[in-house]
């Protein structure tokens, strides 16, 4: 970062807030059968036999009695920011649930880590996809980003965030500086 900054170059990192690798320590802890602080960091069903067809789940490969939601590939478990519409109350949580809020705080910590190292901001992958079961203007996902933007404005006012959203009128209102 220092060499780039010496040359007047700003560095934006690619932030992927919707999922992690299945090798991430958060996920390794989350897949344990015993409840722990990471149990709800990802979205899990309550039984290995439950996998509603409207979602993409990986089934029966962990010690936990449940299946985990993915955004794309089996190696990319989806982080749990909650569900705007609860259709399966035994395992879906609202965005206001403390465990979903803990996911937001963890993502802020990831951002702080890189900003403290010298990054100048982030290009955010799939920024509109955090809260599940949400259509239209995505008000719950917008709340998440406004919360993150508040932290950035207070702690890193020079940091830039650019969304991959493809709806500038929504993403700018959610706190992004630009959208593509």
Predicted regions and their residues:
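Conserved beta-strand->loop/alpha-helix structural units within folded catalytic cores of enzymes
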Residues: 1-16, 114, 119-121
């Amino acid at each position: 970062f220092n060499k780039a900054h010496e040359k007047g170059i700003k560095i934006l990192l690619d932030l992927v807030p919707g999922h992690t690798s299945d090798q991430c320590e958060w996920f390794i802890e989350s897949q344990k059968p015993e409840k722990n602080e990471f149990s709800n960091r990802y979205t899990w069903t309550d039984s290995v036999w439950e996998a509603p067809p409207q979602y993409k789940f990986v089934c029966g490969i962990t010690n936990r009695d449940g299946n985990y939601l993915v955004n794309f590939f089996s190696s990319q478990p989806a982080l749990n920011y909650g569900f705007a519409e609860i259709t399966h109350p035994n395992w879906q949580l609202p965005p206001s649930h403390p465990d979903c809020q803990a996911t937001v705080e963890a993502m802020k910590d990831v951002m702080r880590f890189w900003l403290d190292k010298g990054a100048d901001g982030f290009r955010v992958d799939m920024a509109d996809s955090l809260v599940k079961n949400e259509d239209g203007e995505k008000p719950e996902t917008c709340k998440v980003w406004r919360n993150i933007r508040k932290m950035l404005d207070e702690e890193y006012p020079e940091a830039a965030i650019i969304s991959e959203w493809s709806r500038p009128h929504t993403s700018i209102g959610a706190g992004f500086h630009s959208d593509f």
